A protein has these predicted regions:
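Secretory/periplasmic and organellar redox-cofactor proteins
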Residues: 3-187
């Protein structure tokens, strides 16, 4: 229910005619972004499933992985709400969640394609570190913009900051599970 609810809420923000305050993309841009949101949701679901499988298939870990995948979209929808109701002066909040998910989806597989064990370690760990940095920068940058908005209300800033901390803890826990699984596979 949460999965579908967030997806529908996000699409609602992006349908033509409702997105001018959100991303300043008129007309067909809303349709394109809605399609990207759906595709990103599928990628996030696959990413969460793969992460839970690597971590042992535990249902609790799967839920944690799913929350980590959808956390960015949930916060992003919150940013859209802040923009819509005039709680911040930002007019454009970009998101790299889709690109970040694709990058992270490829990282665990890197450990199995390198021809040499030492090469696999360097490649997988190096790419994983780079992907995490890229993912964090692209996903948290929009929230940072809202935090620094001159008209952003203090209560909204506090809520965003708390959500950032919670999301970071969830994603660190998920990332460590994937890291441990890849390390076990390499050794």
């Amino acid at each position: 229910g949460i999965y579908l609810g967030v997806l529908l809420a996000f699409i609602w923000y992006l349908v033509p005619g409702r997105n001018r305050v959100f991303l300043a993309y008129p007309g067909r841009g809303g349709v394109v972004l809605a399609g990207a949101a759906v595709l990103a949701g599928v990628v996030d679901f696959a990413l969460a499933y793969a992460g839970s499988a690597l971590a042992g298939g535990n249902e609790v870990r799967f839920v944690i992985s799913l929350l980590a995948g959808w956390g960015g979209w949930i916060l992003y929808a919150g940013c859209a709400t802040a923009l819509r109701w005039g709680w911040t002066d930002e007019r454009k909040v970009p998101s790299g969640h889709f690109a970040g998910s694709l990058v992270l989806l490829m990282v665990p597989g890197l450990a199995f394609v390198s021809p040499a064990p030492w090469g696999a370690r360097v490649l997988s760990y190096g790419m994983m570190a780079g992907a995490v940095v890229l993912y964090a920068a692209l996903n948290y940058l929009p929230l940072a913009l809202l935090l620094h908005g001159r008209r952003t209300r203090p209560l909204i800033k506090a809520a965003i900051a708390a959500a950032l901390v919670a999301l970071a803890l969830i994603e660190i826990r998920w990332g460590y599970g994937v890291y441990a699984a890849v390390r076990r596979a390499l050794t």
